[in-house]
Amino acid sequence: MYATQPYLELRERLSQIWINRYTLLLMLCMVKILLFTSSLRFSLNNSKVHVLEECSNIEHYYNILRNGTPHYMGKMGNYLVAHALEATVESLLALLTSLATVVEVVAHFMIELWLGTYACLLFSAAHGAVEVATNVTEKVIGVANKTLIAAANELDNGLDGLSKVLNKIIETGTKVSHLFKDDDEEHASPEGQFKKINLTIASLRTVKIPESVNDKLRSLAEKTPDFEDVKNKTKGLVSIPFQTLKNEINGINATSMLKNRKLMSVPPIDMGDAADGVCSANRDGIESVYRNLNSALIYSLVATAVSLAIVALLCLIPAAWHEYRQWERLSALRDHERTVDCKDPFADTHSSASASTASSTRCDVIQNYQGVFHRAPTLIGEWVARHTAHTQEGALRIQWLLAYVLSPRALVPLALGLAGVLVCGCQFLIIHALRIQLASTSTRDSLQRLETDTAGLVAHDLSRWADSTNAYINGTEASVNAGLLGWVTTATTALNTTVAALLADIDSTVDRAFADTPLHRPMVTVVSCVIGNKLRAIEAGLTWTHDHVRIALPRIHTARLRDAVAEPDLPTHPAYTAVLQSLSDRLRHSVDRVLHQCCAAVRIELYVSLALLGLWILQTPLGLAMLLFKSHCRRRNLRRRVP
């Protein structure tokens, strides 16, 4: 009954039903739920610690939201109000300057309309008379000089022959006189008299009316007073008070006219301690919430674990029944094989030797089944027994022990344990790689940039807001100028075109009527005095109106707005400085805490895998204990049989 076989019998099989696949699956589910619960508790504890530790920061940001928003809105509003008032004063000063310019131009126009017209006509008449006289005198002098020179030339040519005859007579008389007179009487000779008459006739060729008369007339024409001189002098006298007024207006500083911006109230930022804030005042309530969550988590874990344990115990019943049915079938097969009489047709049926030989060569069917369907454990057991056992009984014990340790049920925790150890090793490698990356230079640089980019992001957002607001102001200004003042541009452009065409027509008409005549310039002057100057003044006024009549709305300057909102003299709060300085440390600590949590979870998984390996290793002492128990029972039975 207690003989050792190289395979497992029913009791030995039933000793391993607790490591069936269903029980192991439920045990793994329990471990998974335990890991999940542990992770959840760790997360809740981290959340609790984080919330309680960051109460001061929460209160700080809450104070910024509660008190900082009115503060910065007040500063921005004060800047916008001051900027709007400054722009209003500048617009008013520009309007006063424009009004002074308009009044000055109107005064110039009235002077030119009433006084300038008569003065222009008077001086134009004088200038025209002088110019006509100058032109006539030039022509008369030219004709007279030309005629006198021609007559002198003809007279000189007629007397040329007489001069030659007289010269010969004079030469003859000179020679005769030298014979009868001495040298002292030479000057009273007829020769000298004839020479003087000849000289007076020759000088007629150079007689002409002097051109200095034309020069004097031209000088008189150039010295004739001009309308432009009088007009410019009059405008200069009239412009003096207006220019003084405009200089005084331009010298006014719009900013200095405004009151000090510090007089406008700005709500202060409460940078005090946050001990009496919302978070700190409800610290007990926060802890109570986390205690309730942990209690609910523990109750859920206990209920789930008990339920799974009960189901795992219930799974032992079908496993035991399956092993029992399997053993019954194997036993029936073995009994059937033993009862079959396999006789040799050539052997002696009455020979006892033949029966003894058949009995000794008969094999165990269960052992054959074990060798066929569990080949690896059988071969390993036979190989180990062949190299270590010295007796048949020892070989059977070794084969049985290896069959027990390497049974299909015992191999399940072995496979799960080895797979778990491999997976845990891979997870530890991944966590180690993440820790190396966390401590790398690139991560530190990224965290430092995260700390220093806050001011840049705020400035960028403020610049984007200013740009969008200025774009809206530009569109509104263009719409107002086009909708309300567009008719001014259209009207001034049309009137300027009409005035320019009228001036061109007047000039062309005067040119056609008086071109190449002495009256051309006087008529041009008269027309300019009566009509042209007025039209040109109107054209200049329309051009000025076209260029200056428009609405210019004030723009928002990003740099000024940033300077107005910023507070360089505000004392830095230690809590705020600590928040900025510890930002990278808190991020690094948070990531390291997550990695630590993952490492703890992987460590638990490794312990579970090692526990599964321990379950498989536990089969060895259990098998040895069962072998010892069977040997003890066999020896006790032998002692009972001995009389």
UniProtKB/Swiss-Prot annotation:
The main location is membrane
Q: Where do the TM regions start and end?
A: 17-37, 105-125, 297-317, 411-431, 609-629
**Where on the tree of life does the source sit, at the highest rank?**
Eukaryota
What InterPro entries does the database record attribute to this sequence? PRM1
> Per the similarity annotation, which family is this?
Belongs to the PRM1 family.
Described by its record, this protein's role is as follows: Involved in cell fusion during mating by stabilizing the plasma membrane fusion event.
Q: Which protein, by its recorded name, is this?
A: Plasma membrane fusion protein PRM1
Chain ranges on the Cytoplasmic side, renumbered to this chain: 38-104, 318-410, 630-643
Q: In the UniProt record, does the keyword Cytoplasm occur?
A: no
Q: Which residues lie on this side of the membrane: Extracellular?
A: 1-16, 126-296, 432-608
Q: Does the keyword Transferase apply?
A: no
The biological process GO terms on file are: plasma membrane fusion involved in cytogamy
This protein's species is: Eremothecium gossypii (strain ATCC 10895 / CBS 109.51 / FGSC 9923 / NRRL Y-1056) (Yeast)
Q: Which UniProt keywords apply?
A: Cell membrane, Conjugation, Glycoprotein, Membrane, Transmembrane, Transmembrane helix
Q: What's an example GO cellular component term for this entry?
A: plasma membrane
Q: Which residues are glycosylated?
A: N135, N145, N198, N232, N253, N474, N496
Membrane topology per record: Multi-pass membrane protein
- Compartments where located: Cell membrane
